[in-house]
Every structure is written in structure tokens, then in C-alpha cells.
Amino acid sequence: MNITPVSKNTTEPLACIENIDNHIYDYSPSNEEPKYLKRSKSESTTKLSRQLPRTPSNKYHARNKRRPYSTTPPISLNIPSSPFIHSEFSLNSSSSESSDLESLPDLSEDRDTPFSSPINRNPLTPNNSFFSFTKKNGPIECLLPKRTQISIFEIPEIVYKIVEFADIQNTAVPQEGTPIRRKPLSSNHALLIYGDKKQAELSLQDHYDEHNNDGMLFNCLQVNKLFNQVTTEIISQKFFFSDEMKLHSFLQNLKITQIKSKPSLFVFHKLFHAKQDIIELIKSHMDFSNLQWLEFYMCPKLLPTPEFLSCGTKIKKIVITGSKVIDDGFLSMVAKKCPNLEVLDIRACELISDSGIYQIAKRCTKLTTVNFGRKNKGNLITDSSICILIRNNPNLKTVGLAGCHITDKTLWDLAIRCSDHLQRLSLNNCPHITNQSIPLILHSNLFKNISVLELRFANQITNFKPIIEFKRRQEFRGISILIEVCESLCLMMREQELEMDKVISQRIFEDISYWANDNNDGDVPYQSFINSRRHK
């Protein structure tokens, strides 16, 4: 038998499949028995130990020292079957050489015994056998695509939703909360409102809403690269500060990092000592083309520059309260650049007058919330500008005119044009409002959706009977309404309410008495009723 190599693959052996001949060797049977082949004890192919690979054991190495290594080359186990081969090399225990084989130890039970003679490893044969390599790294497995599992934390859309939800749940923008009702002016005022001493004492105390910000977005920055990128993008959309020390620390780092952010929200909250230099520094490092919410709450020395309104068509909310530098010129600039403005709150800006509000009224026609309340210089805001603003903005829901010198004319315009939408109306300290406006408007059943009406120190209003009746009608409809008045007006309102209750009680009693004492009330007399029952 001659085995001659046909081809060689120096890079990678061919694949081995049991039913396919790879033609690595040409096999030609001959009559001569090869001299280098040696018979060995047969093993049953049905045993499980025959099917599993073996590793040399210590017992095998000890026995192998007494035997010289075979110099025969490795023979492929995938030799084609033929009758000659089966008869020539049959390894059956019933052969004539059984006596010689009985003297050898039984290796069938030795689990660490290999099937073939040991082979010296060299660069040409790095593995135990040719088939051990092909089974591990066959070409079929190499051609199959590798299965990769994508985590949900690697999908940008899902990560953006996760971080956005974390931002909504944990990020608290500093702003003034809307109180359920204003703090009473005195202890007697609190007793008049609540009627209970404990509740009156609680109402006079200051309540602060504590928000637990545990740095959720900071943790999101450290998840992976995608989380860091998405979180940085979301953080850059909101720029707000309520602590001057933190603001100065940020500005120092801003000079070094040269960050260029694009916020949609810009809020400064109660920075009483901040100066205009801060605005000049910040505007050079920010792009305000996406700004929608601009708020300077109680920042008396800060003035927004024209860069803040560079893309004013996107701005929908401007809140600037307690400013000593905002004037009519700023409102004129807002009116020109912010036609889509919806919320304008400029309380306690004493330099604002009818001139600036007139410009807003002419150009901004989508307003839903306006607040021009003030304590001083209320004479600068009158009917001449407010009436035009009401006529051009019929969708007003919240109107604050505290301290302004408006008259009943403005309130009637508001009742006619904004009656269906108005929900909150503040008329505190309005000296020119009389009984010809609010009492008659509510008696006419206008302001059907109003929920808060503030009339503190509106001392010319003395007729509260229509107001009380309107409140009771709203409560009967299931709509709760809050009417805020000062202590003197509260006493007057309570007295008129008691008089109304007395009149109502007296009418109820008269109706019951008339029904009980009327002879012709339609009831059958008792004797007639008894007689009719007897006849039945």
C-alpha cells in the first residue's frame, strides 16, 4: 500500500467532513503488507470511551518510556473502506495473535489512553491530529456570520428617551410656584378665612417645598459613551442658576473650556447682586437661536441683550420681575422680535409704562398670560394700553393688573372679549375699580370659568352680594372659586353673607308655614280619608 501526498496546504488544513473525501492522500492498495504498520489491541467502537477524545495519562507516559516512539507518519482515519482493507487490517480479538495480545494490559477501561501512537509536535503538526484542528476551526463555521447581541443601552433613540425621562423627573428649574392661596395679612385675617385657630396659625407659617435632586443626570454621564453624549446634549438645553457662588464657579470654568451651548431655557432666579458683566461674558459662549424660555426672576441689575432675542420667533415665555433696568425700549424690541410670545410677566418693573405695553399689544396677538402688577408707579399703566391688549388677545387666561390705575372700562372689555377663557384675575390695590364692574359682571353670569379672583384693597367695591351668589352658583356647578380679599373687605363680605343667609332662612320658614296652614292645599281631610277606607 502506497500513500503519496497529492496536495499540501501550508496555511490552513482543509475541512474534514466524514462523508466527503478531501483527497489529501491518494490511496492505492498493494499485495505487500506495509512494514511500518503495527497491530494493536482492538477496541469496541460501540463504547462511549471510543467516541470521546483522550488525553495521555501518567500511566501511558510511564509505559511509553519503555517503548521507542514510532516514526510512522500520522494516518488519516478517514480512509475509504474496501473488502481488502477490512480483511487485511481487521482488529478483532479472535485473531491468531490473541495470545500475544492477552499479555498486554487492557486499555479499553483507561479513559486517559489515546487512540493512536504519540506524535511529536512540530511546526508542521501543531495539534494532536489533523482532525482536532479542522473540527474546531472548520471552514463552515468561519463562513457563518457571527451572532452579535445589541443592548438596549446602545440604541440612541432608547437612550435619549431614558435620559429625557430622568431629566423631567429629577431636574427642578428654579421658579416661583403658584400658591393655592395667598398668605393672610394678620392673625385676625387668618381666623376670618379659616375659622380655626390651628389652621390659622399654620397658614401664617412659611412653607418651603424641598426638592431632592440626587444627581441623576450626573450618574447618566458615567454609564457609557453613548449615555454621556446624550446626557450632555440634554443638559446643554437648560441653563439655570439660583446660586451666585455656583454661577461664578461656572464662569471661571467657562473661560477655560470655551463651551458653546445652545439652550432652549435660560433662567436666573433671585441673583440679587449679579451684574451686567455676567451677561456680557455668557452671551459670547452661547447660541440663543433655540431659546424659548427667558426668565430673570428678581435679578434687578440684569438686562437681556439683543443676542437673547436673535431668534425671537421661537420665544414663547418671558419673565422679568423686580428689574430696575427694564424699560419701554426693551418691550419695543420684544414686540418686534417675538411675535409668537404667549407669556409675558413683568411685575414690579417700575420703568414700564403704557408706551411699552402699547407696542406689545399691537404686535403680540397670541398672549395667554400677562402680568403687569406693581406696588409703585401704578399711574404709568392705564386703560389706554390695557384695553388695546385685551382686544387683540382674546385667548387670555391669566391677567394680573394689581396696582394699575385701570377703571371699570378695562374690566368690561375683558368680560366681553375673554369671558370664556379667563381663569385667574388679580385686581389687588386697583383704586379706580367700583361696584359698576365686578359685581355687575358676575351678576350677569360672565367669567364662567374663573377660578381665582383677587380683590385685596379694592376698597371701592362694597356690594359683595352678587359675588357671593356667583360663588355659590359655581360651587353648585362643581367649579370651586377662590376669592381673595383683605381683612376689612373680608369682614364686610362675611356680614353680607350672614344677612343673605338670614333672608334665605326666613323665606324657607314662610314657605313651610304657608304650606302647613293652608286649608286649600289639595290634601284630603282626615275624616274623609277614614270613611273612604271603611267603605272599601
From Swiss-Prot:
SUPFAM superfamilies: RNI-like (SSF52047). GO terms for biological process: cell division; SCF-dependent proteasomal ubiquitin-dependent protein catabolic process. Its main location: cytoplasm. CDD domains: AMN1. Residues 32-44 have a biased composition (Basic and acidic residues). Residues 45-58, 114-123 have a biased composition (Polar residues). Disulfide bonds: none annotated. Residues 27-77, 94-123 are annotated as: Disordered. InterPro entries: Leu-rich_rpt, Leu-rich_rpt_Cys-con_subtyp, LRR_dom_sf. Residues 94-106 have a biased composition (Low complexity). Keywords: Cell cycle, Cell division, Cytoplasm, Mitosis, Nucleus. Pfam families: LRR_6 (PF13516). One of its GO terms (cellular component) is SCF ubiquitin ligase complex. It is found in: Cytoplasm; Nucleus. Negative regulator of the mitotic exit network (MEN), required for multiple cell cycle checkpoints. Required for daughter cell separation and chromosome stability. Involved in copper sensitivity. Belongs to the AMN1 family. This is Antagonist of mitotic exit network protein 1. It comes from Debaryomyces hansenii (strain ATCC 36239 / CBS 767 / BCRC 21394 / JCM 1990 / NBRC 0083 / IGC 2968) (Yeast). The gene is AMN1.
